[in-house]
From Swiss-Prot:
Protein name listed in UniProt: D-galactosamine-6-phosphate deaminase AgaS
Gene Ontology terms for molecular function: carbohydrate derivative binding; glucosamine-6-phosphate deaminase activity
Other known facts: In Shewanella sp., the active phosphotransferase system (PTS) specific for the transport of GalNAc and GalN is replaced by a set of GalNAc- and GalN-specific permeases and kinases (AgaP and AgaK, respectively).
Organism of derivation: Shewanella sp. (strain ANA-3)
InterPro entries found in the cross-reference section: GatZ_KbaZ_carbometab, GlmS/AgaS_SIS, SIS_AgaS, SIS_dom, SIS_dom_sf
Domain SIS: start-end pairs: 59-217, 222-366
Classification of source organism: Bacteria, Pseudomonadati, Pseudomonadota, Gammaproteobacteria, Alteromonadales
Amino acid sequence: MLTSPLSPFEHEDSNLLLSAEQLTQYGAFWTAKEISQQPKMWRKVSEQHSDNRTIAAWLTPILAKPQLRIILTGAGTSAYIGDVLAAHIQQHLPLATQQVEAISTTDIVSHPELYLRGNIPTLLISYGRSGNSPESMAAVELAEQLVDDCYHLAITCNGQGKLANYCADKSHCYLYKLPDETHDVSFAMTSSFTCMYLATLLIFAPNSQALMQCIEMAEHILTERLADIRLQSEQPSKRVVFLGGGPLKAIAQEAALKYLELTAGQVVSAFESPLGFRHGPKSLVDSHTQVLVMMSSDPYTRQYDNDLIQELKRDNQALSVLTLSEELLTGSSGLNEVWLGLPFILWCQILAIYKAIQLKVSPDNPCPTGQVNRVVQGVNVYPFVK
């Protein structure tokens, strides 16, 4: 149980109800700091974007191309940003003939001709915490090789990375560097994920009111809900399932990865949509399985969420069936799901770090033997010959 090590501390250096000394002892200092700093970082990213006078000018002629194809790309957590946002950005493009797709760098690198179209003008938006993952530069270089009219927008937390250096001084490239604090030191991406995610929304579909609601919800979680999340983490689960529909499916995927990473695989995690869960994945639910359903803010979609929740409760097989909703955090409803994803993933990040500490796994370095690394290693990138 976490009750003893997670007792509250009124201390300026505390995060997530843990003192700095405890966080260091548990190998959780950086992860806790980076999770907790997110509302502050969202404000900082927004302020930085408001001061940016060049991104709109660079994008305007590109967004005037009727057949423009935008690819949102990254690897792992960075790839999930595109999965969350692609359909939403599609709705905000100026021309109906333009297209947005989320394609991971890992797919582009292994199957370049399957995903890249030489005769279609393409804006490749690359996400990278460090910008040093082998696939990041390989995807950029393949796009340069195969696409006749290609542009690059690098959204990164590291101004010194390979991706940043490539895009810094080329007219068909734009480097959108986030504040240094978003370059997470810990193993798992937390604030880097949400800040690259937010930057994309600010560029293509800004909504200042929605952002303020997200910040308020995140602050509510960090000041009022930590004890609730801690209790959820104390349940003796061996499996955890995150469910979300539409954009929230990719948030569920990122939540599952965070749980898997921070617990070093000691708790098996899975994700699906509420409707998709019945089509086979529901088989993994047993008395050791926690299920967390991320509720849609759309009344139509929510009917499907509620149906599955009631079904899981009637089945009485799961260890617990938890719900995460806008009402839980604010008492109101109606915020678009792409914005809800920000406070929802914060909740799940906290759940994962608490579970890791309970299992005596260091969240800052959950895999000290090196099978999995903060920046991916061991990837051979081969030349592509047309």
